[in-house]
């Protein structure tokens, strides 16, 4: 089963992502700040990290850089999931090592499509 770490300090976003992904047989972990995200990434080694830029302690850009600099964690996929939607924001996210960039508000269908693109054969719909 694919494991996804959601890093966001907005409970509504975390809940939306959790509901969207758990319905598709994806295990979801959560972190509300950068330090917790780094700890959980090291402990659980998720396949994918959905990472907000604006976190209360360490910025999402710094978390992304640290994950990509760690040889044991560098292969995990990272999607910046953030309201920062300017061209410069996107460039900074990708320069920090993010594999993709998804702006808020986002469509759950677009999120699933992006997860499937980055993690092929991950999404499996539960029977009705």
Question: Which sequence ranges carry the predicted segments?
Answer:
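Short hydrophobic/Thr-rich beta-strand motif most characteristic of the beta2 strand and flanking loop
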Residues: 25-32, 40
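C-terminal output helix
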Residues: 106-116
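Active-site beta3 strand of CheY-like receiver
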Residues: 44-50, 55
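Charged docking surfaces used in two-component/phosphorelay signaling
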Residues: 15-23
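The feature encodes the CheY-like receiver
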Residues: 14, 56, 74, 86, ...
């Amino acid at each position: 089963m694919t494991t996804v770490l959601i890093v966001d300090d907005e409970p509504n976003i975390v809940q939306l992502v959790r509901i969207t992904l758990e319905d598709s047989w994806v295990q979801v972990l959560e972190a509300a700040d950068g330090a917790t995200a780094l700890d959980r990434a090291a402990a659980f080694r998720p396949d994918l990290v959905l990472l907000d830029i604006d976190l209360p302690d360490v910025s999402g850009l710094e978390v992304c850089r640290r994950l990509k600099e760690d040889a044991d964690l560098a292969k995990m996929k990272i999607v910046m999931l953030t309201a920062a939607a300017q061209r410069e924001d996107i460039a900074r996210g990708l320069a920090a090592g993010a594999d993709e960039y998804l702006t808020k508000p986002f469509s759950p269908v677009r999120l699933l499509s992006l997860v499937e693109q980055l993690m092929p054969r991950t999404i499996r719909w539960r029977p009705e």
